[in-house]
Amino acid sequence: MRKLTLLPLLLIITGLLTVQAAELHFQVFIKGYNGTAELGIFGENLSKVETVKNGSIISLPAGNYTLTLFALNKTFVKDLRLDSNKTVTFNLLFTNRTENLSMMRHAIVQPSLEVFEIVLITNSGGENFEGDLAIPLPEHTGLKISDSSLSFLDFSDLNGNLTLKKLIVPANSTGEVSITYRLVKPKLSLSGAENQTVLIFTTLPVTNQSNAAYRGVQQFKGVDYSVYQCKTKCVLEFKVEPEIKIDKTSAFVILTASALIFIYLFTKRGGWEK
């Protein structure tokens, strides 16, 4: 008889636990947009779409979710760890002004005059950037974009600039674009760009320089690289020597390590919010 009376009690407890698990909620706030939007919610055992507006409250079981908000013909993505009642803010404010954008460039010039470069683009403003961004390049051939964590519609390689068209850089964030190209002669000459810093790594002897500061030597996998830094117009001329083969993977490992050091130092001084 006792076993029979325990069954309803267990069902009640299970029901209460289920209700408690579903009691967590998050509230949606949308900056810069007053209409309705479609919110996709994707979890381990749940997938649904809700129509939301600024201030909407969504109840869900505790867990990890990916949220996709579709508005203004764009999709905004956020990750949510729902372990307590929370708020989620989507920033739909946009600008095409570039004063809050800065570029930190890390480039390896190989003995073959092939250049591997990672361009870190930081938006330190409170609005998302959407527009065209020109990246000055030296005289080159064979430009390729090998990877990008940022979204852009197209690009052009004209008048000494790589122009990323309809580039989107979220507010208070940093993304990267990886490119390769080949110098047409042993000379790297960059025109000025606002809020740009360039670190250049090379094993080639530098025979002449202008507006470039020597930053010493960094060693990667037993190879010594001379490091130069410039911000405005700068020129480095190289003495071409017998080629030392450096595979592309190793080159990007070097650049990524350098870029990560920059990101670490930048975040330590409070460069952007996460």
Swiss-Prot record:
It is a single-pass membrane protein. The chain crosses the membrane at residues 249-266. Keywords: Membrane, Signal, Transmembrane, Transmembrane helix. Its main location: membrane. One of its GO terms (cellular component) is membrane. Residues 1-21 form the signal peptide. It is found in: Membrane. This is Uncharacterized protein AF_2114.
